Amino acid sequence: MPVQGSQRRLLGSLNSTPTATPRLGLAANQTGARCLEVSIPDGLFLSLGLVSLVENVLVVVAIARNRNLHSPMYCFICCLALSDLLVSGSNMLDTAVILLLEAGALAARAAVVQQLDNVIDVITCSSMLSSLCFLGAIAVDRYISIFYALRYHSIVTLRRARRVVAAIWVASILFSTLFIAYCDHAAVLLCLVVFFLAMLVLMAVLYVHMLARACQHAQGIAQLHKRQRPAHQGVGLKGAATLTILLGIFFLCWGPFFLHLTLIVLCPQHPTCSCIFKNFNLFLTLIICNAIIDPLIYAFRSQELRRTLKKVLLCSW
């Protein structure tokens, strides 16, 4: 993912000498001030990436193997898993190449490394964009299933879902290529930030509206059966907790990365911003963690998918 020069480690690794860094400590910024820097060990980063990779591969395989899961909803979930898989895989590849170059185990010309860096950046950026898009698509799909339940199967058909999936992938690859080519322009970074905020607002509005409808439905059932108000309050609290977790994880995992991009535009030389820039690898790690959490939220809660996954694992043994 293109950011400022210090983060483009792949090309710089040709002439770099690895130095030991603490996992958590104080580092000096450009003005000599002390700032907090969290260093993520490469082993931990690769381990998290591997967990995400395996987890999302299992989701894709389970959905592909079970024809009962070939529905629009699971189509979006499968594509989300594929996007998260690419996010993890591309970052793992980037880190692995860096380590091999720094150790001298891989010899390559600067031009070759630059091309490889560009390819990895495009894959990473496009998979991030598609991951955000599919999170939004899942929210829209759930919204339609609740507010237009009787017309859902005529509105959200498998053909339309496939068209949406194709459009998301094509747009993600196209825009990520443009973003990488013009990564030095502030407008490009601001476009990415605005896109993230748009997805955040879209998901928040849709899920809050769905929560309000669920509370109204629970209240109607309670009145029909002459139940006490605490039952309705329990539904509201449970829904609010679920909504808080869902949006909270999304914001905490993705927010720091896009804050990083925003500060590159607003205050690239400010001492405080420089301290934040030092934690770029931490922000990437949070995105990898989101790729680990996504299957737990959107995929593994399905009993049908869990049964299919169990069969796949048993057959593999």
Swiss-Prot record:
The keyword Methyltransferase does not apply. One of its GO terms (molecular function) is melanocyte-stimulating hormone receptor activity. Its main location: membrane. Residues 1-37, 94-118, 184-191, 267-279 are extracellular. The keyword Lipoprotein applies. InterPro entries: GPCR_Rhodpsn, GPCR_Rhodpsn_7TM, Melcrt_ACTH_rcpt, MSH_rcpt. A lipid is attached at C315 (S-palmitoyl cysteine). It is a multi-pass membrane protein. Coiled coil: none annotated. Keywords: Cell membrane, G-protein coupled receptor, Glycoprotein, Lipoprotein, Membrane, Palmitate, Receptor, Transducer, Transmembrane, Transmembrane helix. The chain crosses the membrane at residues 38-63, 73-93, 119-140, 164-183, 192-211, 241-266, 280-300. One of its GO terms (biological process) is adenylate cyclase-activating G protein-coupled receptor signaling pathway. It comes from the Eukaryota. It is found in: Cell membrane. Residues 64-72, 141-163, 212-240, 301-317 are cytoplasmic. Glycans are attached at N29. One of its GO terms (cellular component) is plasma membrane. Receptor for MSH (alpha, beta and gamma) and ACTH. The activity of this receptor is mediated by G proteins which activate adenylate cyclase. Mediates melanogenesis, the production of eumelanin (black/brown) and phaeomelanin (red/yellow), via regulation of cAMP signaling in melanocytes. PANTHER family: G-PROTEIN COUPLED RECEPTOR. Belongs to the G-protein coupled receptor 1 family. Interacts with MGRN1, but does not undergo MGRN1-mediated ubiquitination; this interaction competes with GNAS-binding and thus inhibits agonist-induced cAMP production. Interacts with OPN3; the interaction results in a decrease in MC1R-mediated cAMP signaling and ultimately a decrease in melanin production in melanocytes. This is Melanocyte-stimulating hormone receptor. It comes from Trachypithecus francoisi (Francois' leaf monkey). The lineage of its organism: Eukaryota, Metazoa, Chordata, Craniata, Vertebrata. The gene is MC1R.
